[in-house]
Amino acid sequence: MTTFTAKSETVQRDWYLVDAAGKTLGRLSTELARRLRGKHKPVYTPHVDTGDYLVVINAEKIVVTGNKLKDKKYHRFTGYIGNLKTESLEQALQRHPERVIEIAVKGMLPKGPLGRTMYRKLKVYSGAEHPHAAQQPQVLDI
């Protein structure tokens, strides 16, 4: 008997639609990262991308607990001296709400080429509309 190893060309990848309205940021992000990796499947193999495609809608309606809206900070550096930009979660949700979920999920995925291919299967939209109707995503309740 040999150990089963999934092959990336034979993995069945499904499309799922997730509504983020009223969901907690961290709890939603962990489940999204788990499904992007494919850990929910019996054919999960750590070195093969076995995850599904995820379409997240209503990213602007995400909620956080405690004082994180004011206390949580996002930093980015432009590359120029003295240009470390900092914004709170509240400001980030106003400017680009989809990026908040993307950053949270990306930090939970592996760092490297495999993690980047997993991350590309995540599609986040701030409103209720998305351009992936042709893929017929199944509604996933998280």
From Swiss-Prot:
Q: Which InterPro entries match?
A: Ribosomal_uL13, Ribosomal_uL13_bac-type, Ribosomal_uL13_CS, Ribosomal_uL13_sf
Keyword Metal-binding found? no
PROSITE patterns referenced in this protein's UniProt entry, alphabetically: RIBOSOMAL_L13
Q: Which GO terms describe its biological process?
A: negative regulation of translation; translation
UniProt key word Nucleus? no
List the keywords (alphabetical).
Ribonucleoprotein, Ribosomal protein
GO MF annotation terms? mRNA binding; structural constituent of ribosome
Query: What NCBIfam families is this protein classified in?
Result: rplM_bact
| HAMAP family referenced in this protein's UniProt entry, alphabetically | Ribosomal_uL13 (MF_01366)
Subunit-structure text: Part of the 50S ribosomal subunit.
Query: Which family is annotated?
Result: Belongs to the universal ribosomal protein uL13 family.
Task: Give the protein's function.
Answer: This protein is one of the early assembly proteins of the 50S ribosomal subunit, although it is not seen to bind rRNA by itself. It is important during the early stages of 50S assembly.
How is this protein named in the record? Answer: Large ribosomal subunit protein uL13
Give the source species.
Xanthomonas campestris pv. campestris (strain ATCC 33913 / DSM 3586 / NCPPB 528 / LMG 568 / P 25)
